[in-house]
Amino acid sequence: MATSLQTKYTLNPITNNIPRSHRPSFLRVTSTTNSQPNHEMKLVVEQRLVNPPLSNDPTLQSTWTHRLWVAAGCTTVFVSFSKSIIGAFGSHLWLEPSLAGFAGYILADLGSGVYHWATDNYGDESTPLVGIHIEDSQDHHKCPWTITKRQFANNLHFMARGTTLIVLPLDLAFDDHVVHGFVSMFAFCVLFCQLFHAWAHGTKSKLPPLVVGLQDIGLLVSRIHHMNHHRAPYNNNYCVVSGVWNKVLDESNVFKAMEMVLYIQLGVRPRSWTEPNYE
């Protein structure tokens, strides 16, 4: 009497910590054998889409509101940059606005680190003004690679809002080309810091050669320098513009000192003290 044995092997997902909407699809493999001779083993591979494809995840897609904020942010930065260039042509003084722009670039990296440290370690989705970004930050630490799947305006719109609301009044209030040399470069780096951050999670083969070149010479934060931020103890390499401040801040324990002060004064523990290992 023929006896058939059917065994089903289900490939369990290895991304248990990944939110449901971000988990990739997995396969169910069915292997069927028959004890009778001259019967071949049959392998049936059935693909089951457990969740929608990541590319269709609405949380990663841009909306028209996102695009409008990014357009507004770019416009305010362009106006500031134009005032700096026009003023430099008119006065024939290029050194001062150039130095101001360099200072803006350097301080933007520092600012990105302080902001990144704060949102990584304190607050939650109910925090005023930045709650949505704190929630996104925590999701990013659970699934770092998803930042490379975010559409352009989706990734930048939050920083674009802040840039617009701060730079627009400065555009209206000041015409000094040195002031705008600093403002335009600082605001540009803040506006696009999440793009630089996403590039730091990309692979060289998928990045534009110009971006890879800027990363290699240290003008933009690179994958090599940023990857340590996503490794235990999750309390370093917070700066995401150029990363030039990371070594200074980490070796001097600036953030650790700030965490101790906040804990002693307010009793608030940073998340990095108890951060689970997401790897």
UniProtKB/Swiss-Prot annotation:
It is found in: Plastid, Chloroplast membrane. Keywords: Chloroplast, Fatty acid metabolism, Lipid metabolism, Membrane, Oxidoreductase, Plastid, Transit peptide, Transmembrane, Transmembrane helix. Pfam families: Lipid_desat (PF10520). One of its GO terms (molecular function) is oxidoreductase activity. GO terms for biological process: fatty acid metabolic process. One of its GO terms (cellular component) is chloroplast membrane. Its main location: plastid. InterPro entries: Chloroplast_FAD_CarF, Lipid_desat. Pathway: Lipid metabolism; fatty acid metabolism. Its EC number is 1.14.19.-. It is an enzyme of class 1 (oxidoreductase). It is a multi-pass membrane protein. The chain crosses the membrane at residues 68-90, 98-118, 178-198. Residues 1-30 form a transit peptide. Fatty acid desaturase involved in the production of chloroplast-specific phosphatidylglycerol molecular species. Catalyzes the formation of a trans double bond introduced close to the carboxyl group of palmitic acid, which is specifically esterified to the sn-2 glyceryl carbon of phosphatidylglycerol. Belongs to the fatty acid desaturase CarF family. This is Fatty acid desaturase 4-like 2, chloroplastic. It comes from Arabidopsis thaliana (Mouse-ear cress). The gene is FAD4L2.
